[in-house]
UniProtKB/Swiss-Prot annotation:
This is Serine/threonine-protein kinase RIO2. Residues 337-346, 429-447 have a biased composition (Acidic residues). It catalyses: L-seryl-[protein] + ATP = O-phospho-L-seryl-[protein] + ADP + H(+); L-threonyl-[protein] + ATP = O-phospho-L-threonyl-[protein] + ADP + H(+). Expressed in pharynx (metacorpus and posterior bulbus). Expression is restricted to adult stage. One of its GO terms (biological process) is maturation of SSU-rRNA. Residues 411-428 have a biased composition (Basic and acidic residues). The active site is at D228. The gene is riok-2. Residues 331-366, 411-452 are annotated as: Disordered. One of its GO terms (cellular component) is nucleus. GO terms for molecular function: ATP binding; metal ion binding; protein kinase activity; protein serine kinase activity; protein serine/threonine kinase activity. It comes from Caenorhabditis elegans. Disruption phenotype: RNAi-mediated knockdown causes early larval arrest. In adults, results in no obvious phenotype.
Length: 529
């Protein structure tokens, strides 16, 4: 961990930041922004923009990228940091940047200060690192977009975390005070303490365990689940008070996997206390026992809470039913409890009215469509597997039904003879036959010239038999003709020459290619006028 090099900010002029903002605006719909577009957005002459971009490239605030078709400039993460710090300095929110105090798969954390030298915490979101690139699976920043740049996703993550910080702070949760946000930078209060994973001793482990479990339940009652509630995202102060950090993965309790995330948070706390403090409690919260008290997930549009679900929930709230957010099983249980109580008969009627609504009002249309597609795919795979098993069973039954005796009775059928155990190569068969004949003659002499007819027949069959296999193993490989090899080598040389010819050289390579194309067009239509 080190310091962020912000010394160049004091030497940058207004035109430098003007060009940086122009590149940022051009990257909304361009992967690389051409020089002409940067000049048009910045409102500066192309020559002045080119000189300014050269200065910015020297300090790695922008990067020039060349390709086969397009050349242009791209904003780097350092340039994005400078733009965020410049805006916050102009608002008089940030006055200095200090050492780095934390690093993660999604962000970097630095110590900072305001113009009055009060300590602040600066969190720079860094989405797109190689250690965490499955953003579309793990986070909902994309929503329905097919693609987006890492800088834009970092900006969305910062805005989402700032919104969660403000909402949790207003409801009395122990979180750092949110100060301001700009692009991918979140400014918050600096919390002086140590993470729970580094704590070695507490006065009362049971009381701390109860406070953490109560905090999980309190968040669930307000409609959200932390999703990553572990010892690395909890800071303990000197008086053993707990402060929560890191909220980009918070989900709604109406998320399809809400119970899994809730149980995972509870399991993380129980496992940590058993391992660290040798404390294990028999009581822990259950997801089915949570009763909603607020709708913070609706206000913040947490993951898993769709607009249609929000409309249905608001409609139920207007009718006076505060249990419409629960799942179907929880509704059935509460209906039974309400049915037993005669005084709550009106509430049970309202619950039945809500249950009679169609399912498409309770679930998102996209989720239902996805479920139908998965069911169809499973049916297709199942039909293919059953078809194969049926064919295999029919084939085995047919093989078992074959009558070998009937085949033997047919003409042309001969017994299949296996090679003997001491079978050798055909090249050595003549020598072996001579040795066998000598041995057989000796045996005949020993037996006084009396040889059985069966032995003579076996001897004739052995000599006439053709070996059905060989002991040696030969490897086979595909061979190429000389003409084929020459043709392939010539093709490789041609491709290498084309690669060298297409190699981009110089900053104005795209301009040169366009001019060459224009010359060809002019030469083609020469003399027409």
């Amino acid at each position: 961990m080190g310091r962020m090099n912000v010394s160049m900010m004091r030497y940058l002029e207004g035109d430098h930041f003007r060009v940086l903002i122009a590149v940022e605006m051009g990257m909304k719909n361009h992967e690389v922004v051409p020089l002409a577009l940067v000049s048009a957005i910045a409102g500066i002459h192309r020559g002045g923009v080119a000189r300014t971009l050269n200065d910015l490239c020297k300090h790695s605030l922008v990067a020039f990228e060349r390709s086969k078709k397009f050349d242009g400039y791209r904003l780097t993460i350092r340039g994005y940091d400078y733009l965020a710090l410049r805006a916050l300095c102009s608002r008089e929110v940030v006055g200095s940047v200090g050492n780095q105090i934390g690093i993660g798969k999604e962000s970097d954390v630095y110590v900072g200060g305001d113009p009055e030298l009060n300590d602040l915490c600066l969190k720079f979101h860094r989405l797109g690192r190689t250690s965490f690139r499955k953003i579309k699976e793990k986070r909902d920043y994309h929503k329905k977009r097919k693609s987006a740049s890492w800088l834009y996703l970092s900006r969305l993550a910062a805005a989402k975390e700032f919104a969660f910080l403000k909402a949790l702070q207003e409801r009395g949760f122990p979180v750092p005070k949110a100060v301001d946000v700009c692009r991918h930078l979140v400014v918050m209060q600096l919390v002086v303490g140590q993470t729970l994973c580094n704590v070695t001793h507490v006065e009362d482990a049971g009381a701390l365990y109860d406070r953490l479990m109560a905090l999980i339940v309190k968040m669930a009652r307000h409609g959200v689940i932390h999703g990553d509630f572990n010892e690395f995202n909890l800071i303990m102060l000197e008086d053993e008070r707990i402060v929560m950090i890191d909220f980009p993965q918070m989900v709604s309790i109406d998320h399809p996997n809400a119970e899994y995330y809730f149980d995972r948070d509870v399991t993380c706390v129980r496992t940590f206390f058993k391992r660290k403090f040798d404390y294990e409690s028999e009581d822990w919260p259950k997801f089915d026992e949570v009763e909603r008290k607020g709708n913070m997930d609706v206000l913040l549009e947490a993951s898993g809470f769709t607009k249609k679900m929000a409309l249905d929930l608001n409609k139920a709230y207007d009718e006076g039913d505060f249990l419409a957010h629960c799942e179907q099983e929880l509704r059935n249980r509460q209906e039974e409890d309400l049915g037993e109580d005669e005084d709550d008969s009106d509430d049970s009627k309202s619950m039945e009215d809500i249950q009679e609504e169609p399912e498409d009002l309770e679930k998102d249309h996209e989720e239902l469509q996805a479920q139908e597609n998965t069911v169809k795919q499973q049916k297709i795979v199942l039909s293919q597997t059953t078809r194969f098993t049926d064919w295999l069973s029919d084939a085995t039954n047919q093989l078992e039904a074959v009558d070998l005796d009937a085949l033997k009775s047919e003409e042309g059928y001969k017994d299949i003879e296996l090679p003997p155990e001491d079978f050798k190569r055909p090249a050595d068969s003549e020598n072996d036959d001579e040795n066998d004949e000598d041995e057989e003659e000796g045996e005949e002499e020993d037996a006084d010239g009396h040889v059985a007819v069966e032995e003579q027949v076996a001897k004739v069959v052995k000599k006439k038999r053709v070996p059905s296999g060989a002991r040696s193993v030969a490897s086979s490989a595909a061979t190429f003709t000389a003409e084929d090899v020459k043709r392939r080598l010539a093709l490789d040389r041609k491709r290498n020459k084309e690669k060298i010819r297409l190699k981009v050289k110089g900053k104005q390579s795209a301009v040169g290619r366009n001019r060459k194309d224009n010359k060809d067009v002019i030469a083609e239509y020469a003399g027409w006028i």
